[in-house]
């Protein structure tokens, strides 16, 4: 469910929504959602000083409150 929200939010921001890829991994009990976007959309998804991706991450952590902390990152 959390991945679907991230995908929806990022696709809504992207100028090339068909290039958006979202994956989830767990390492040492920590969940990480990684977002891949086109280079043109990277700045738009990250936002000024990381505000946009941080806001998405905050919402994700509220949604996943019972399941622990989830990190959201944008792949290079």
Each language-model region and where it sits:
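RNA-contacting regions in translation and RNA-metabolism proteins
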Residues: 1-44, 52-76
